[in-house]
Amino acid sequence: MQHIQDNDKLYRYLFQHRAVRGEWVRLNETFSQTLNTHQYPKAVQHLLGEMLVATSLLTAIMKFEGNITVQIQGDGPLKLAVVNGNEKQQLRALARVQAEIDDQASLAEMVGNGVLVISIIPTEGERYQGVIQLDKPTIRECLEDYFIRSEQLQTHLIIRVGEYAGQAVAAGMLLQIMPDGTGTPEDFEHLMTLAETVKDEELFGLTAEALLYRLFHQEQVEVYPAQTTAFKCGCSRERSGQAMLLLPMAEIEEMLAEKKGVIDMQCECCGTQYFFDKPAIMLLKEEAAKLADLGLT
């Protein structure tokens, strides 16, 4: 039986005598809504689920206000896969597929020669971008390598994607040795061994409390209040209009003629459509010109 009270939730926790911290997340509606507006191949759906889980866990462990973008770029059938998340656990995802992809395709078969790009964009402070070659079989292993290289912290990820109670679900756990240097490799290995005994149905179906007890009942674990995850696209009519105004006016006029006087712009992420007729476009141009005169663009 699935305990829906912990669907679309993220929990952080601390092993009090081990100097290791952890996180657990389960994405139900958050994941389903990502897939609803696109007919992605199954292998791409699976990869996006993994990336959503990874981004959620990364955003929680960074503890800052802002955004994290996890992006895969390659020269294979999957040209691009990108997930964005913020400190409120608002997530969105997008993929661009340029050739047929088998349902069982591996990461390497989908991406070809590719890189994993992690962009950290705080509301205040400097941006950071890390680029890692996708030279390991899974996104999980690539991210663990990222933590070793960039943070010098032992990190272990468990990421599972599947179906439970008739619904798509993606879930995962993170263990990381504390950055204060008090943790030992032996403690970390011990907890990692326990975590690896988790079954898919436990990740997908148990409450966080039941899952942590099942895995770590001999440990003292302090669990922090849950965060709710959600699919949230950042698109708007204003942003769509601004994007359209980047086109030459002659091209906009041509589009208006082809579309019988109304241009529709569809968000690539969530599928929302925005419609603009010529009066609306001229109004947007006037507003943009006023802002430019005021030096606000």
Swiss-Prot record:
Gene name tied to this protein: hslO
GO BP, sorted A to Z: protein refolding
UniProt similarity note: Belongs to the HSP33 family.
Compartments (UniProt record): Cytoplasm
Name of this protein: 33 kDa chaperonin
Domain of life from the UniProt record: Bacteria
Disulfide bonds: C233-C235, C267-C270
One Pfam short name: HSP33
GO CC annotations, alphabetized: cytoplasm
Protein role: Redox regulated molecular chaperone. Protects both thermally unfolding and oxidatively damaged proteins from irreversible aggregation. Plays an important role in the bacterial defense system toward oxidative stress.
Keywords on record: Chaperone, Cytoplasm, Disulfide bond, Redox-active center, Zinc
Post-translational events: Under oxidizing conditions two disulfide bonds are formed involving the reactive cysteines. Under reducing conditions zinc is bound to the reactive cysteines and the protein is inactive.
Gene Ontology MF annotations: protein folding chaperone; unfolded protein binding
InterPro entries associated with the record: Heat_shock_Hsp33, Heat_shock_Hsp33_C, Heat_shock_Hsp33_N, Hsp33_helix_hairpin_bin_dom_sf
Main location: cytoplasm
